[in-house]
Regions:
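Cross-family detector of peptidyl-prolyl cis-trans isomerase
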Residues: 1-128
Length: 128
C-alpha cells in the first residue's frame, strides 16, 4: 500500500497532470473535438489499455475491431471520475488508486490493493 501511495504521489508531482483531491491523477494525451462530457448514465465507446504499476498490461482493446461499449456508471469509480471530464476524441492517461479501482478484491491478473494506470480514448458518446 505504501508503494502505491508513493507511486501516485510521484505521478501527482509531474508537470502537466491534473491531480484530484481523491487521489486520481489525469494526464491529457490528446485533445478531442467534442463539446460535451458524458454523464454517469451515458453509454460510451472507448479504446483503452490497463496496466499495473510495473507496466504489465492486464486488459486492452488493442487488436479489437471495435471500441468497447460501456455505461459510465457501471465502470470502476476511477474510470467514472475520468470519463465525466472527457470529450469525444480526448485521450487521457489516468492513474487510479486502489480504493477507486478494485480495492481489496483480486481480479484475474490484478492483485488486491493495486494502483492502476489506464490509457483511455473516448471515441464516442452513444447516449447522453
Amino acid at each position: 500500500k505504501a508503494d502505491n501511495e508513493a507511486f501516485l504521489a510521484g505521478k501527482a508531482a509531474e508537470e502537466g497532470v491534473l491531480a484530484l483531491d481523491n487521489g486520481v491523477v489525469i494526464r491529457k494525451l490528446e485533445q478531442g473535438r467534442g463539446k460535451v462530457h458524458p454523464a454517469p448514465g451515458s453509454v460510451v465507446y472507448v479504446n483503452y489499455t490497463g496496466r499495473l504499476m510495473d507496466g504489465t498490461v492486464f486488459d486492452s482493446t488493442d487488436g479489437q475491431a471495435l471500441p468497447a461499449l460501456f455505461r459510465v456508471r457501471d465502470l470502476i469509480m476511477g474510470w467514472q471520475i475520468a470519463l465525466v471530464r472527457m470529450h469525444e476524441g480526448d485521450k487521457f492517461r489516468v492513474w487510479i488508486p486502489a480504493k477507486y479501482a478494485y480495492g481489496s478484491a483480486k481480479m484475474d491478473m490484478i492483485p488486491a490493493w493495486s494502483t492502476l494506470e489506464f490509457d483511455i480514448e473516448l471515441v464516442k458518446i452513444a447516449q447522453i
